[in-house]
């Protein structure tokens, strides 16, 4: 009887230790992959067009890093997320210039990101305030 209790206790301890090693970033891998911008704004006033679509692409990696481009500049850095809260903790960018006003706005909005939402696994919204967001679609 004591042997069974000891085995049971060991099994429970192993499960608890195993669960503690899973980080939320390992479980929430829905963000990982490449995303392309299709517009920005909110549900009532959404901006899109040829000067926006496919001009920004970000690839999020496991471990809180990302890379990509906000045309014509390459970007990379780190991000942090807890629940639906999201922030870019470091953004490095080349400074090639040539951005039109919409692309500058998108870059500023991305830098101001406070939360995120993934809809249907293929739409990413990076919210820069309570209702306005930059909308991405999953590329891969």
Describe the predicted segments one by one.
Residues 8, 20-140:
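Lipid interaction determinants
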Residues 1-20:
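Sec-dependent bacterial lipoprotein signal peptides
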